[in-house]
A protein has these predicted regions:
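N-terminal secretory signal peptides that target proteins for export/translocation
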Residues: 1-3, 40
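Alpha-helical segments with a strong preference for the paired helices of cellulosomal dockerin domains
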Residues: 499-524
Length: 524
């Protein structure tokens, strides 16, 4: 504040000496311009910025229905007995009031994972109807026959599949892995029919949910099918598994090569180096390619996001997962709740696990991509950081997830731009970032209310920042944000001196007066 007063006092002194010179009007952000005016009443800036009222903490999620969570800890294992891990799946109840008098023991249900709600799409069939529920259209069978590619497609990725590795550590791992591997075999062979489970592999409804969810979350490249399972409504035991094909299957001869080609084009530009460098490139390349849109809401797979450049959270997460795994980086597709149902990733970077949310690093501004994207506020964060605004779902929605505690690969730690508005030297740091990055400074703000704190600090210190940058002429400034990441932008003419005080010192002296007089008389 003392610098601001000296600067204003200095200008007044010069203006009294040079009364005929034009007065410089300093433009400010229209959100709260009055508090930031340095010399005269500010003009209102028309550059679009994310105000506190209009900015969004990342993308809107995909469904208004909260995803339920259960009471098990993230490391809890599925019990061997039929105790439900799903709080919405009640104890076995037989409704004897059915008007059609159908015995529930004869009712079979097919449950398929829904990528939008993260719940199960459940269809009920009588025993006779279930026999006729196979996908047997000639068109589909022809498509499947012409698209058989064997295991080579899925062998392109050689890193460990996270979901399978977690199933392998559970008490009933032998049964779970046999069913998981059978699903993979069905995907490799484009199996259409239901596949019955041997008697010694019968599992409960929730166990089947867990295994199919683990498989689904392990294979982002399987964009033409979702796993499903059949269970008896009365016993709640799973007896059969099946793949539920979508419309991509009919065009797979064209779409599969295009999917691979698009991924390989992106991967071709990836730098050689550490996992962090590869991940950062892939994260940013994906965000620059994709537009968040509900037009592909029903698709929710990696193809539409990667190839067509359109998607919502599931598409972002599947596409990033696939690119990371192609780059040799272990990754997993995680579902949960973040204001609405949401999906993001786990990634193992240079030996440590982190969370990364590409969707929320690509926020929407006024219905369009934010001009300062890609952001990195959710790039390699810890579990504690994630839980500020994300809640991962428990079993059976996810397998047990990592407790991420490492911070070495957190973007803002790597770039030394984690700040508090109470930090000393912050004016000089921000001025330096703005000058080195074309008038844009990305910061991770640790204050309890990062947006409010950063905005107030910026408006209070803008004159000092401009002076440190040796600005010539008027300027505009504002901010944008996603989560704790605050983007400060500054539009103006920077003088050629090294960022700092006008004459390189912190004191007010004759050199300051001479420089200011030169600017007011010559504009340079």
């Amino acid at each position: 504040m003392r610098k601001m007063k000296r600067w204003a006092a200095l200008l007044c002194a010069v203006l009294m000496a040079v009364t005929l010179l034009p007065t410089q009007v300093w433009a400010t952000d229209g959100t709260d311009g009055g508090s930031a005016a340095a010399l005269e009443e500010p003009i209102v800036n028309d550059k679009p910025t994310m105000s506190e009222e209009t900015a969004t903490d990342g993308q809107p999620a995909d469904d208004q229905t909260p995803a339920p969570t259960d009471d098990e800890t993230p490391d809890a294992e599925v019990p061997e007995e039929s105790e439900s891990a799903d709080p919405q799946e009640p104890e076995q109840e037989v409704d004897n009031q059915d008007t059609d008098n159908t015995d529930d023991s004869d009712v079979l249900c097919r449950a398929t994972l829904d990528p939008i709600s993260h719940e199960l799409e459940v269809e009920q069939f009588s025993a006779e109807e279930a026999a006729d529920a196979e996908i047997t259209s000639a068109e589909l069978n022809n498509a499947l026959t012409s698209n058989k590619s064997g295991s080579s497609y899925f062998d392109i990725i050689s890193v460990t599949r996270y979901g399978r590795a977690k199933l392998a550590k559970m008490s009933r791992s032998t049964v779970y892995l046999k069913i998981y591997d059978r699903l993979l075999e069905m995907a490799e062979n484009f199996t259409v029919d239901k596949v019955s489970l041997p008697t010694n592999q019968k599992i409960t409804h929730d166990e089947a949910w867990l295994v199919t969810a683990a498989f689904y979350s392990d294979y982002p490249e399987l964009f033409w099918a979702r796993p499903s399972f059949w269970y008896n409504k009365n016993t709640m035991l799973c007896s059969e598994i099946q793949l539920n094909y979508n419309s991509h299957i009919y065009n797979l001869n064209t779409e599969l090569p295009l999917f691979l080609e698009t991924a390989e084009t992106i991967l071709a530009g990836m730098p050689t180096g550490s996992d962090y460098e590869k991940e950062l490139y892939l994260h940013d390349a994906l965000i620059k390619k994709v537009t968040y849109t509900y037009s592909k809401l029903e698709e929710q797979n990696g193809y539409t996001t990667l190839v067509e450049g359109k998607g919502v959270c599931a598409g972002y997460a599947f596409a990033l997962q696939y690119l990371l795994m192609r780059a040799g980086i272990q990754s997993y597709y995680v579902v949960g709740y973040a204001g609405e149902n949401h999906a993001w990733n786990l990634a193992k970077i240079d030996g440590e696990w982190y969370y990364v949310d590409a969707t929320w690093d690509d926020p929407v501004y006024n219905g369009s991509d934010d001009p300062y994207s890609p952001y990195h506020s959710y790039f390699n964060i810890t579990t504690a950081m994630l839980q500020e605004d994300h809640t991962p779902s428990d079993i059976p929605y996810n397998v047990p997830l990592e407790n991420c505690t490492a911070t070495d690969a957190f973007y803002y730690k790597v770039n030394d731009t984690i700040v508090s508005t109470t930090d000393s030297g912050l004016v000089e740091k921000v001025a330096d970032l703005l000058q080195r990055n074309g008038g844009i400074a990305h910061l991770y703000v640790t204050d309890s209310n990062p947006v409010m704190a950063a905005r107030e600090w910026y408006y209070e210190n803008i004159v000092s920042i401009a002076r440190a940058m040796q600005v010539g002429g008027g300027y505009e400034y504002g901010y944008s944000y996603s989560g704790r990441e605050i983007v400060l932008w500054f539009a103006g003419e920077f003088l050629s001196k090294t960022p700092g005080e006008l004459n390189g010192s912190s004191g007010l002296d004759i050199l300051d007066v001479e420089l200011l007089y030169q600017y007011l008389t010559t504009g340079s």
